[in-house]
Design a protein with these regions (language model features):
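Acidic, polar ligand-binding/catalytic clefts
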Residues: 1-42, 116-117
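A ligand-binding cleft/hinge motif common to bilobed small-molecule-binding domains
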Residues: 2-11, 61-62, 89-121
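Periplasmic-binding protein-like
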Residues: 21-28, 103-141, 162-171
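Short helix-loop capping/hinge motifs at secondary-structure junctions, enriched
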Residues: 31-39, 71, 132-137
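Short helix-initiation/N-cap motifs at beta->coil->alpha
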Residues: 35, 71-85
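Short loop->beta-strand "edge-of-pocket" segments that line small-molecule binding or catalytic clefts
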Residues: 39-54
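Hydrophobic residues within well-ordered alpha-helices
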Residues: 43, 83-84, 127, 139
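Ligand-binding clefts/hinges and TM-proximal coupling segments of bilobed small-molecule sensing domains
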Residues: 55-71, 110-112, 141-171
Length: 171
């Protein structure tokens, strides 16, 4: 499980320094009336779904601001089920999860776009620890070394960076 670093979460757990930054993405069916959207304005009438307590739900509410309330589900798999059942037009989640959704959970769907990084605070991933855990400083030191040696970038380039061909949806 990946965890985005948020102020709310940081109040109850400790995070390592970020090791990966990603964008939010939009998953739709290719024949959706919203598939050609190039800006968030083109999504105002879309019924969008996201999992509760996620940065994706925050993104829908704070950046896209659709005319109808987003549909909220317990888990991403529930959002996928709603899309498969035709209950929502699309779902918003981070780009790596969007690749998984389109490949496994929502057959025939596409990543219609990724949102500009400037549209909201970056979605930084960090390792999660119980509050006060003494391992945080050790993990941060290891992450700093991996970053300084270029290993984090190498891992990202090999395993996590695929968004170049996905269209950008502007704010």
């Amino acid at each position: 499980q990946q965890y985005s670093i948020t102020d709310t979460r940081d109040q109850v757990v400790d995070f390592s320094e970020p090791y990966y930054t990603t964008r939010q993405a939009l998953v739709l069916y290719p024949d959706s009336e919203f598939a050609g959207a190039t800006s968030v304005d083109g999504l105002k009438d879309a019924v969008l779904g996201a999992a509760i307590g996620t940065t994706s739900l925050d993104f829908i509410e704070d950046v896209i601001k659709p005319s109808s309330e987003p549909s909220v589900y317990d888990e991403n798999v529930d959002v996928a089920a709603a899309m498969n059942a035709g209950q929502i037009d699309g779902l918003v989640l981070d780009l790596p999860a969007a690749y998984y959704m389109t490949a496994v959970e929502v057959e025939g769907s596409i990543i219609a776009g990724q949102f500009e990084a400037e549209a909201a605070a970056p979605d930084d991933y960090g390792m999660l620890f119980a509050e006060g855990n003494s391992l945080v400083s050790c993990v941060n030191a290891a992450l700093a070394e991996l970053k300084d040696e270029g290993k984090l970038q190498e891992l990202e380039d090999t395993w996590l960076t695929q968004g170049g061909e996905i269209p950008i949806i502007s704010d």
